[in-house]
């Protein structure tokens, strides 16, 4: 199960131009199906990724929701309160990764 979540997260990261929301503070009682059901009210959801902790077997309380359209993502971001399993979760746009700097570049003195 963890391997399939890792493959799904990797595929999601590769789809740079896809509309993806980053969701934090997901209650440990919530499943990806609940996440998909909640966000489907804003637009068609292609997939939801909840990475699991190998040691505990529970998801890590964060995840990604990939929409089929930018409109779905915008609709979700415009909603102020997202409640899943009685808990208010935080929804953000996926931020592009910044280029890594080497240790030599960090030492600017």
Curated annotation (Swiss-Prot):
It comes from the Eukaryota. The modification Phosphoserine is found at residues 15, 102. SUPFAM superfamilies: RNA-binding domain, RBD. Its main location: mitochondrion. GO terms for cellular component: acrosomal vesicle; mitochondrial matrix; mitochondrion; nucleus; perinuclear region of cytoplasm; ribonucleoprotein complex; sperm flagellum. GO terms for biological process: flagellated sperm motility; mitochondrion organization; negative regulation of mitochondrial RNA catabolic process; single fertilization; spermatid development. Residues 19-103 form the RRM domain. It is found in: Mitochondrion; Nucleus. The modification Phosphothreonine is found at residue 101. RNA-binding protein that acts as a nuclear receptor corepressor. Probably acts by binding the SRA RNA, and repressing the SRA-mediated nuclear receptor coactivation. Binds the STR7 loop of SRA RNA. Also able to repress glucocorticoid (GR), androgen (AR), thyroid (TR) and VDR-mediated transactivation. This is SRA stem-loop-interacting RNA-binding protein, mitochondrial. It comes from Homo sapiens (Human).
């Amino acid at each position: 199960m963890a391997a399939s979540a890792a493959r799904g997260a990797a595929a999601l990261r590769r789809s740079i131009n896809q509309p993806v929301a980053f969701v934090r503070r997901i209650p440990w009682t919530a499943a990806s199906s609940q996440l998909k059901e909640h966000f489907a009210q804003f637009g068609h959801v292609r997939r939801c990724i909840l990475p699991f902790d190998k040691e505990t077997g529970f998801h890590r309380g964060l995840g990604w929701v990939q929409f089929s359209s930018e409109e779905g993502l915008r609709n979700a971001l415009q909603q102020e309160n997202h409640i899943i399993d009685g808990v208010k979760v935080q929804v953000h746009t996926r931020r592009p990764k910044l280029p890594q700097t080497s240790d030599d570049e960090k030492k600017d003195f």
